Amino acid sequence: MNNKIIDWHICKFPKADKWDVYRKLLEEVGELGEAMARNINKNIELELGDVMICLIALSGQLHMNLEDMVKQSHKKNLMRG
């Protein structure tokens, strides 16, 4: 699924760089916060999905594997106790 999202993003926004994607991520996080403040579950789900898409697109821009990063972070957090 991640590769499909990265491919879609490259086709849809061919001139976007990592900073463009980062700015979009910040925008989507703000929209998630607004949805959470209104406590509307459907909007929260949609905005959380948008945040995830931005994270996947950003990982593609940075040539990093998001799944591997999550696994590494989870392992680090488990070791903290």
Predicted features, each with a name:
Residues 1-48, 52-81:
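Flexible "arm" and connector segments at domain edges
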